[in-house]
Amino acid sequence: MIIKIGDTITDERGRTATVEQIGIGTTKSDPAGELGLKADEYDLELNYLGAITFGDYWCYFNQIRSVNKTDIKVLNENWIGF
């Protein structure tokens, strides 16, 4: 599964938000990738250490459960009362 900046993801806790940053760990002492490389996209099948920030949250790569590649748009004319 490939994740990119701007994708909407859901983690194992059910939190959903837009990916803002992808950090890849380059040492064992930095598993979240805070000091490592920053990327615009990452293939989770590579199994590197690292983490993403999304909305007010962050999670390790192995905690990502789904990636929504399409934006969810709510049209005002579909609401009752408009």
What are these regions (language model features)?
Residues T26-K38:
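Short, solvent-exposed secondary-structure boundary/capping segments
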